[in-house]
Amino acid sequence: MTAILERRESESLWGRFCNWITSTENRLYIGWFGVLMIPTLLTATSVFIIAFIAAPPVDIDGIREPVSGSLLYGNNIISGAIIPTSAAIGLHFYPIWEAASVDEWLYNGGPYELIVLHFLLGVACYMGREWELSFRLGMRPWIAVAYSAPVAAAAAVFLIYPIGQGSFSDGMPLGISGTFNFMIVFQAEHNILMHPFHMLGVAGVFGGSLFSAMHGSLVTSSLIRETTENESANEGYRFGQEEETYNIVAAHGYFGRLIFQYASFNNSRSLHFFLAAWPVVGIWFTALGISTMAFNLNGFNFNQSVVDSQGRVINTWADIINRANLGMEVMHERNAHNFPLDLAAVEAPSTNG
């Protein structure tokens, strides 16, 4: 008997690297999207931490009035933020090498652009990595589709809105009070609370929270009893066990009697699809709303829409909101312009008799 031994070609270094990158046996899956995700998110995180602690004030409005955002310049965790790139820069790509010095780059808010653009690349790659791992494991792709909702929301406030408004200085500041400031100014300029897509987003987030709490509490409550009536049902289970611990038929029966029969799911797959789709679709709509308001297609305006027979305005809640919007608008960027845009746009009365 003759044995033929074939010498196996040793795999190249590149081949071993590719196998390691795409291996599903690693403790944390890397993947080709991860090759870009890891450096971009590390960069965004590192610069965020350094800038939040030590960045000097930024001339956000481009009028030589720097605004302090870092901890070392007098802020705390609540008031601190990464101040958006200066209006003097607008939408220009502003890496460090485009500035005359690092001091100039910091003064004009260069770190904001650096953080935001790396962050958006990173989270987009994280979404791609979710799809890639699902593909390698033979799973369906809906995890990445669900994650597209927060990715779209982040892209809307950090990229699409500044593009529509013409400057990164209009992007959302990276901090707690900065986020609230962004929301208040957004309401003042775009009447977002009266936009149907924002309403759908509110229904998505609040409804998703409600459905998540209902589902979790119902599953936890409808245990398959493994004990006698005289001891706690909890004694029949150990945390993380593989065996099924709840009965969907019992849960369906409970909920069907609590509300009505057809308000309850008796199919686990359709139930979980609903739990995923409701908040995702809501947040998609909100991101779409921000992206349309970026180009000044604003919320509904019912101001002074109710009048009496003499043509006198009967104030409604729309007029109250309008008055609040004007108040918020005159308070922000108070030194950048003399009047809010709504007032400045009104035609001056004729004075020639």
Curated annotation (Swiss-Prot):
Chlorophyll a PD1 binds at residue 198. The record marks 344-345 as: Cleavage. Chlorophyll a ChlzD1 binds at residue 118. PROSITE patterns: REACTION_CENTER. Tyr-161 forms a radical intermediate that is referred to as redox-active TyrZ, YZ or Y-Z. A quinone binds at residues 215, 264-265. Fe cation binds at residues 215, 272. Its EC number is 1.10.3.9. The D1/D2 heterodimer binds P680, chlorophylls that are the primary electron donor of PSII, and subsequent electron acceptors. It shares a non-heme iron and each subunit binds pheophytin, quinone, additional chlorophylls, carotenoids and lipids. D1 provides most of the ligands for the Mn4-Ca-O5 cluster of the oxygen-evolving complex (OEC). There is also a Cl(-1) ion associated with D1 and D2, which is required for oxygen evolution. The PSII complex binds additional chlorophylls, carotenoids and specific lipids. The modification Phosphothreonine is found at residue 2. The keyword Manganese applies. The modification N-acetylthreonine is found at residue 2. The record marks 161 as: Tyrosine radical intermediate. Residues 345-353 form a propeptide. The chain crosses the membrane at residues 29-46, 118-133, 142-156, 197-218, 274-288. It catalyses: 2 a plastoquinone + 4 hnu + 2 H2O = 2 a plastoquinol + O2. The record marks 190 as: Stabilizes free radical intermediate. PSII is composed of 1 copy each of membrane proteins PsbA, PsbB, PsbC, PsbD, PsbE, PsbF, PsbH, PsbI, PsbJ, PsbK, PsbL, PsbM, PsbT, PsbX, PsbY, PsbZ, Psb30/Ycf12, at least 3 peripheral proteins of the oxygen-evolving complex and a large number of cofactors. It forms dimeric complexes. Belongs to the reaction center PufL/M/PsbA/D family. NCBIfam families: psbA (TIGR01151). Photosystem II (PSII) is a light-driven water:plastoquinone oxidoreductase that uses light energy to abstract electrons from H(2)O, generating O(2) and a proton gradient subsequently used for ATP formation. It consists of a core antenna complex that captures photons, and an electron transfer chain that converts photonic excitation into a charge separation. The D1/D2 (PsbA/PsbD) reaction center heterodimer binds P680, the primary electron donor of PSII as well as several subsequent electron acceptors. 2 of the reaction center chlorophylls (ChlD1 and ChlD2) are entirely coordinated by water. Herbicides such as atrazine, BNT, diuron or ioxynil bind in the Q(B) binding site and block subsequent electron transfer. This is Photosystem II protein D1. It comes from Panax ginseng.
